[in-house]
């Protein structure tokens, strides 16, 4: 296991099977290395700092597909055809579901 610290409250944990972003002790997103599918959980605070780190996590580690939604209504976005604006839009839409207005700094 390897751990990369993004800031004092956010870490990325690398294991044999997945790469996971944590905010404090809560899992935010997990990328499964075998199938390259990423699940984004609902169990986090959607703070601006966490959203920014999720954006950076997606941009750096998600190279194939991102899984959006809950079973049975799951959509897959193919990251080879997605640019940073699309990633930002995805995160913004998820945040707006939870009432977060200011989402990410422009990058």
Question: Predicted regions span which residues?
Answer:
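Terminal leader/tail segments of proteins
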Residues: 1-107
């Amino acid at each position: 296991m390897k751990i990369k610290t993004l800031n004092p409250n956010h870490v990325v944990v690398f294991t044999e099977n997945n790469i996971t972003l944590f905010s404090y002790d809560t899992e935010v997103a997990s990328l499964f290395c075998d199938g390259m599918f990423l699940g984004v959980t609902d169990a986090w605070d959607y703070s601006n700092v966490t959203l920014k780190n999720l954006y950076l996590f997606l941009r750096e580690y998600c190279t194939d597909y991102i899984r959006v939604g809950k079973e049975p209504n799951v959509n897959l976005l193919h990251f080879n055809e997605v640019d940073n604006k699309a990633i930002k839009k995805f995160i913004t839409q998820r945040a707006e579901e939870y009432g977060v207005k200011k989402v990410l700094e422009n990058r």
